[in-house]
């Protein structure tokens, strides 16, 4: 029996060694598979993070672009509203010039005085309406010549009363709406 017992023990040792080898091989394969799965999962997570970052960047850019567009539209709307009377003002300037010429004429008689008074009231009403819209006269008489505001149509020699580059006489009034010139003043400039 001792031989049988010995053989049985040897068989058990051999079987146990083989089983241990098989188990360790299986464990190694399982560990390698788990490591591969972990690497793949980490790679997928990194890819998803990169995609998320890209999408967040696109979202932020689109949001900033939308905000810029809204600001630009608001500014354009304000500019349009501010200068809405520009064309009408340009069209009214000849009428104002004519009314000013009519008021400058000397009249005789009560009826003519009454008519002149009506023209003055009409002129004042137009000036007031234009002023409410931001249209105002450009001051020129005695001012330094500014080519952005004045149009020199004639020059005269400079004197002590009228130094060089100053406006001596205004031939036609100029007007501006806020910071835009509707019509430059036609002036005589000392040289």
Swiss-Prot record:
The keyword Chaperone applies. One of its GO terms (biological process) is protein folding. The keyword Plastid does not apply. GO terms for molecular function: adenyl-nucleotide exchange factor activity; protein homodimerization activity; protein-folding chaperone binding; unfolded protein binding. It is found in: Cytoplasm. InterPro entries: GrpE, GrpE_coiled_coil, GrpE_head. Residues 22-38 have a biased composition (Acidic residues). PROSITE patterns: GRPE. Residues 1-39 are annotated as: Disordered. Its main location: cytoplasm. Keywords: Chaperone, Cytoplasm, Stress response. It comes from the Bacteria. Residues 1-21 have a biased composition (Basic and acidic residues). GO terms for cellular component: cytoplasm. Belongs to the GrpE family. Homodimer. NCBIfam families: PRK14140.1, PRK14156.1, PRK14162.1. Participates actively in the response to hyperosmotic and heat shock by preventing the aggregation of stress-denatured proteins, in association with DnaK and GrpE. It is the nucleotide exchange factor for DnaK and may function as a thermosensor. Unfolded proteins bind initially to DnaJ; upon interaction with the DnaJ-bound protein, DnaK hydrolyzes its bound ATP, resulting in the formation of a stable complex. GrpE releases ADP from DnaK; ATP binding to DnaK triggers the release of the substrate protein, thus completing the reaction cycle. This is Protein GrpE. The gene is grpE.
């Amino acid at each position: 029996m001792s031989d049988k017992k010995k053989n049985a023990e040897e068989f058990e040792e051999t079987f146990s060694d083989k089983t241990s080898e098989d188990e360790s091989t299986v464990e190694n394969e399982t560990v390698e598979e788990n490591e591969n799965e972990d690497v793949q999962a980490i790679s997928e997570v990194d890819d998803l993070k990169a995609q998320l970052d890209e999408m967040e960047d696109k979202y932020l850019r689109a949001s900033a672009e939308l905000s810029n567009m809204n600001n630009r539209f608001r500014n354009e709307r304000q500019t349009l509203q501010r200068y809405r009377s520009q064309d009408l003002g340009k069209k009214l300037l000849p009428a104002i010039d004519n009314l000013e010429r009519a008021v400058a004429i000397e009249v005789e008689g009560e009826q003519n005085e009454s008519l002149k008074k009506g023209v003055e009231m009409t002129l004042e009403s137009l000036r007031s309406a234009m002023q409410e819209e931001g249209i105002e006269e450009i001051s020129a008489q005695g001012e330094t010549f500014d080519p952005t505001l004045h149009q020199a149509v004639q020059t005269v020699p400079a004197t002590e009363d009228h130094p060089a580059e100053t406006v001596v006489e205004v031939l036609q009034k100029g007007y501006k709406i806020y910071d835009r010139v509707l019509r430059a003043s036609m002036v005589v400039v000392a040289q």
